[in-house]
């Protein structure tokens, strides 16, 4: 089922609507009645009217509605969702909290909610959600204080409070949104569903998100990878630290997961990652309004030397390049600018430049074929107003079709000019580094959207019974990590592993090594020795190594160790050996310095032999049980 009617409903029912001051039910009703183009139906069995609208007792009396917003207590919410499903309502937003974020009882309640929603194939947002905003139909189905301005950014967040803060800030900046979704606990709909929906929406130019965790990593990567071919996705992913992950778990019940895995997965999906809120929206403004650069070479044009140097440093910090102008460009700038100006990049038109001199320099810099983007930096001067310069920048950017970011280093004097630039889709900032980072976001999206990715490897020959058996045996021994059985585990997942075997005598080691096609490596099998090379407990040799016939031992802090001269290994073939402690009595004693150059090492702490050949080919289930 698509999400079209979630974002463009004609009739919305509010279950739990009320006139009680300070209540969520009243806030949702007031927000819907303020701008919503459709019809709002209050549902409350205990009153006849809410805010001048006649109420109905339950969803069986609402007639056809496209969306039900649920603001009743959690003990009642599941029955309301069930009734919505029975009445054929496609979309439900559960604002009610008290589910998976509250502990085991709430988690059980959330599982039941999910089961009900899935039974009726409902598009369910939440629970524990602020609600949903769709500016295309003027719908504010939230209990937040602000309606979003109309725009082309779609935004999802696991934090409802963050949405209220963002809307307050964005309204002041004049930044608009297409859709805004408070994901809540993501019992049914999650980031994958909204990424897909907004990827298909021609009115969404950029997708932004604040996430504490991603439930189905592979599915999200697949969905995002398809969308980011055309539509940029920028995320702030929190819970990066141990303390942050713990806080995320208490906030929405989210398991934050491995930071390294998120970094790799988001990169594979073509998702841009912002470190903070400012960077999130700086990137969004550039991506929503500017073309992509054809090269990484940036031209900086400024009327102030110091800020120009700041911008130049930021170019290098971002991994971009300062454009090297052609001789024709340098000649042209030399004619347009006074001798005291700097015609090389960064171009300094100096502080007495009027709008005509600035315009000529911008035009010439953007005309250079090596320039992929430009950053215009200006400080307040008496001979030039920011409004005059903003009009020139809008004109030249449209003429050349190259991305431009602007740094107007002023306060109130720059506000009107910034509004002019923002209306034209040109980002404007006070800090030169922010302007350059916005250009870097364009470069990053250009590269990620055109990058070819290998499809994820799929292993059809997976034996879950073998994996379960290996792990259960290790758990039965009280072990928290596995040793050589790791190769069996990888093999059970269909992952190729080197050939080899576990042996318990020099003769067996020699026999296995000689049967391996290629060089051989031998290592100790002992749960007490993690870094075997530190104590000489591993060795390698080529196939041409002569096989000695004697056995020696030596003592160290790890106890007596059996040394068996043998061939050893290599890059892709291995032979492991383990000798029980009882066999060491027949060995002679030697110092570590007398250990032969090529030997296998077996820790005396191995009181039994590992019989599982860890590098062997896949065995059948019956063969494993027969061993």
Give the role of each language-model region.
Residues 1-627:
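Catalytic-core regions of core metabolic enzymes
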């Amino acid at each position: 089922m698509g999400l079209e009617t979630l974002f463009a409903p004609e009739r919305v029912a509010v279950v739990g609507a009320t006139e009680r001051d300070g209540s969520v039910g009243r806030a949702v009703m007031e927000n819907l009645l303020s701008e919503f183009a459709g019809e709002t139906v209050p549902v409350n069995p205990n009153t006849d009217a809410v805010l001048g609208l006649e109420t109905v007792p339950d969803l069986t009396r609402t007639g056809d509605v496209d969306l039900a917003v649920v603001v009743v207590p959690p003990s009642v919410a599941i029955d309301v969702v069930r009734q919505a499903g029975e009445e054929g309502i496609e979309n439900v937003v559960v604002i009610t909290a008290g589910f998976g974020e509250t502990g085991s009882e709430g988690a059980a309640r959330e599982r039941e909610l999910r089961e009900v929603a899935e039974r009726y194939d409902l598009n369910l947002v939440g629970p524990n959600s602020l609600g949903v905003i769709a500016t295309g139909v003027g719908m504010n189905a939230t209990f937040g204080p602000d309606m979003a301005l109309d725009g082309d950014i779609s935004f999802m967040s696991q934090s409802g409070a963050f949405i209220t803060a963002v809307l307050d800030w964005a309204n002041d900046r004049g930044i608009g949104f297409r859709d805004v979704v408070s994901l809540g606990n993501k019992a049914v709909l999650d980031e994958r569903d909204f990424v897909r929906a907004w990827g298909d929406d021609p009115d969404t130019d950029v997708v932004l998100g604040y996430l504490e965790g991603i439930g189905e990593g592979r599915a999200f990567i697949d969905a995002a990878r398809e969308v980011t071919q055309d539509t940029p996705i920028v995320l702030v992913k929190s819970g990066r630290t141990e303390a942050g992950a713990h806080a995320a778990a208490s906030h929405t019940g989210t398991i934050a997961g491995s930071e390294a895995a998120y970094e790799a997965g988001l990169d594979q999906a073509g998702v841009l990652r912002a470190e903070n809120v400012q960077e999130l929206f700086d990137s969004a403004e550039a991506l929503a309004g500017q073309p992509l650069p054809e090269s990484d070479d940036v031209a900086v044009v400024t009327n102030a030397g110091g800020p120009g140097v700041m911008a130049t440093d930021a170019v290098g910090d971002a991994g971009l390049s300062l454009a090297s102008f052609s001789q024709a460009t340098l000649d042209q700038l030399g004619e347009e600018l006074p001798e005291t100006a700097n015609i090389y990049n960064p171009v300094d038109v100096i502080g007495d430049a009027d709008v005509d001199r600035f315009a000529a320099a911008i035009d010439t810099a953007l005309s250079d074929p090596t320039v992929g983007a430009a950053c215009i930096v200006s400080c307040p001067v008496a001979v030039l107003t920011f409004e005059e310069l903003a009009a020139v920048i809008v004109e030249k950017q449209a003429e050349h079709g190259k991305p431009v970011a602007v740094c107007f280093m002023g306060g109130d004097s720059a506000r009107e000019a910034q509004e002019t630039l923002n209306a034209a889709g040109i980002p404007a900032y006070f800090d030169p580094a922010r302007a350059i980072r916005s250009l870097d976001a364009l470069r990053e999206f250009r590269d990620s959207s055109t990058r070819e990715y290998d499809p994820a490897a799929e292993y059809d020959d997976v034996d879950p019974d073998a994996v379960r058996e290996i792990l259960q045996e290790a758990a039965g021994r009280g072990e928290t990590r596995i040793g050589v059985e790791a190769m069996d585990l990888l093999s059970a997942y269909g992952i190729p592993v080197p050939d080899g075997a576990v042996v318990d005598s020099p003769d067996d080691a020699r026999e296995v090594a000689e049967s391996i096609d290629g060089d051989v490596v031998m290592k100790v099998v002992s749960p007490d020795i993690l870094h075997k090379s530190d104590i000489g407990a591993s060795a390698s040799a080529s196939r041409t190594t002569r096989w000695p016939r004697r056995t020696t031992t030596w003592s160290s802090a790890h106890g007596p160790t059996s040394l068996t001269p043998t061939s050893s290994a290599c890059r892709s073939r291995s032979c492991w050996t383990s000798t029980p402690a009882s066999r060491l009595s027949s060995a002679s004693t030697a110092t570590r310095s007398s250990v032969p150059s090529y030997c296998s090492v077996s820790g005396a702490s191995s009181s039994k032999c590992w019989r599982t050949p860890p590098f062997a080919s896949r065995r059948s289930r019956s063969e494993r049980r027969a061993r």
